[in-house]
């Protein structure tokens, strides 16, 4: 028997299989990644949207931040995190006082409120400090270990007297020369850039004893040795130590520096020059005039 009603779709020639888009959707629903997104991703997006809506209220956000701040403060102010005092080692009393002035702290305070790196940079920036380490020791002690600069010379400049280390870095001002009679005196523009050479000259001038008054940098090129009685030994730019040794040897043999001499000029090594004092020059001219008569 034939059915009374025929399938109209078959009469029209329509394919009973699903459409391309329907087939793709069915395949997508069977994909593990899409199933995971439906199971986990959609709930997460819903929760994120709800949280965003809830936090959009200013009062709620302020209450949360206040709670977090209180919890943090309660943790940071626990006794084991509190710093009670500062200890400075390796520095003189004056330098320790200067360090405490540079990094003023109101104890007790939490160790979380201390920026140790910034404190160290500020301490090392002080002229008398060569290096420093800053750390918090058990027991709530802020320990600062300082390596001070060692002054080796005193530099006389238009602003006064300044102690200088071997690298020419300023250590600190000096009120008067007699505060550090153990240090040699240098002067002149650019003298601090040649401290090591000045120290070599100072050691070579040892036989001059207490007659030595200082070493002056002239024209930022060479040195003058300044003695008492306004005498000067004018050294050349090259080989100043050797030139000074020759003058000292000449003085040992002939006592040249004990005579009425103002300048011993060694700037021209092949032609050293001696300048007599005005009194000695006048006497010499008188002797010549008498000898001509």
UniProtKB/Swiss-Prot annotation:
Gene3D superfamilies: Cell division protein FtsQ/DivIB. GO terms for biological process: cell septum assembly; FtsZ-dependent cytokinesis. Its main location: membrane. It holds the Pfam family FtsQ_DivIB_C. One of its GO terms (cellular component) is plasma membrane. It comes from the Bacteria. The chain crosses the membrane at residues 28-48. Essential cell division protein. This is Cell division protein FtsQ. The lineage of its organism: Bacteria, Pseudomonadati, Pseudomonadota, Alphaproteobacteria, Rhodobacterales.
